[in-house]
Design a protein with these regions (language model features):
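Domain-level signal for soluble alpha/beta catalytic cores
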Residues: 1-200
């Protein structure tokens, strides 16, 4: 009987608490006090630090902590054609607190384009060495599907997709394209995060 071996025996999700310097920089950017370039400089510095910490702890996988994101899942969806978002002050309750989320909805058919997350991955990949591999995390296709059929989005989604089957088909094709983009950029550890199970 053949033996199957995995790259390592433990793993972690890869989303880390944001350091204060990062939170301060994002707030300053939102308030117009610093430029996008200045924000990116801080983000890159903090990612470099968190990668160094993961290596120091002996992990064989490294992530960027999802430090570039505003939301763990929605930012990824914004990287496709046909998806728009705006901050309307709405949100969902999480641990008895209101988490303010950008409304994310369709304005056309879903199609892949050059996804910004692939560029984010390339920054992370430079830190790979003989002991570590860069991992990137994205929301699962089911998460994307769920976002587009929540009650607030259902009517808008139906303007572009008459059936769930058509919606699922386009999500699948778009994901295949973006996953190929990650592969071509050298990504060999792509994690799909799926929180839709809690809605079953």
């Amino acid at each position: 009987m053949s033996k199957v071996t995995t790259p390592f025996r433990y793993d972690f999700v890869g989303s880390f608490l944001r350091p204060q310097a990062l939170k301060d920089a994002k707030a300053a950017y939102q308030d117009g006090k610093i430029s996008k370039d200045e924000l990116d400089k801080v983000v890159n510095e903090e990612i470099t630090k968190v990668v160094a910490k993961q290596k120091e702890l002996g992990f064989h996988v490294i992530t960027d902590g999802e430090f570039r994101r505003t939301f763990w899942h929605l930012d990824f969806m914004w990287g496709f054609e046909g998806v728009a978002h705006e901050n309307t002050g709405n949100g969902v309750k999480f641990n008895a607190e209101l988490a303010v989320l950008d409304d994310t909805y369709l304005v056309g058919k879903i199609k892949a384009k050059a996804h910004p997350f692939v560029e984010y991955f390339k920054f992370l990949k430079q830190f790979e060495d003989e002991n570590t591999v860069a991992k990137y995390t994205i929301p699962a296709p089911a998460q994307f599907f769920q976002q587009m059929i929540v009650p607030a989005n259902y009517e808008t989604t139906r303007k572009f997709y008459a059936t769930n089957e058509e919606l699922i088909q386009d999500i699948g094709v778009a994901y295949q394209d973006v996953i190929k983009q990650f592969y071509d950029a050298g990504c060999r550890n792509l994690q799909l995060d799926d929180c839709t199970w809690g809605a079953i």
